[in-house]
From Swiss-Prot:
Main localization (coarse): secreted
Cellular compartments annotated: Secreted
InterPro entries (alphabetical): Calcitonin-like, Calcitonin/adrenomedullin, Calcitonin_CS, Calcitonin_gene-rel_peptide, Calcitonin_peptide-like
Organism expressing this protein natively: Ovis aries
Proregion residues excised on maturation: 26-77
Keyword terms of this UniProt record: Cleavage on pair of basic residues, Disulfide bond, Receptor, Secreted, Signal
GO BP term, pick one: adenylate cyclase-activating G protein-coupled receptor signaling pathway
A Pfam family it matches: Calc_CGRP_IAPP
Identification of the protein by name: Calcitonin receptor-stimulating peptide 1
GO molecular function ontology, one term from the record: calcitonin receptor binding
Signal peptide region: 1-25
Family, similarity comment: Belongs to the calcitonin family.
Gene Ontology CC terms, in alphabetical order: extracellular space
Cystine crosslinks: 81-86
Length: 125
């Protein structure tokens, strides 16, 4: 039974060692070296690099503008109030806001609370 487990392990070990040998044959320095020398590029490679950079820049700007449009479109924009119904609602809102201000600022303090919340008398018999 243990014999059947051994060949896959052996094949896997040989494959790993073979790949490790291939990596040692390739120079690590050129891959991990942080310096980039544009003089080593020929004209076609430099054009491809420039096109890729421009494409990435355009995609970045497109994403930024789409994000700005999404946030701008989510704001509530008020329409112009030209109809009679709209003007009536607007005037009623203004009067209700100013009514509380008038009540609190212009009524004498002796009258305010007791008059508006006193006992209600029903004169309908």
């Amino acid at each position: 039974m243990g014999f059947w487990k051994f060949p896959p392990f052996l094949v896997l070990s040989i494959l790993v060692l073979y790949q490790a040998g291939m990596f040692h044959a390739a120079p690590f320095r050129s891959v991990f070296d942080g310096r980039f020398d544009p003089a080593t590029l020929d004209e076609e490679e430099s054009r491809l690099l420039l096109a890729a950079m421009v494409n990435d820049y355009e995609q970045m700007r497109t994403r930024e503008s789409e994000k700005a449009q999404k946030t701008e479109g989510s704001r509530i924009q008020k329409r112009a109030c030209n109809t009679a119904t709209c003007m009536t609602h607007r005037l009623a809102g203004w009067l209700s806001r100013s009514g509380s201000m008038v009540r609190s600022n212009l009524l004498p303090t002796k009258m305010g609370f007791k008059i508006f919340s006193g006992p209600r008398r029903n004169f309908w018999f």
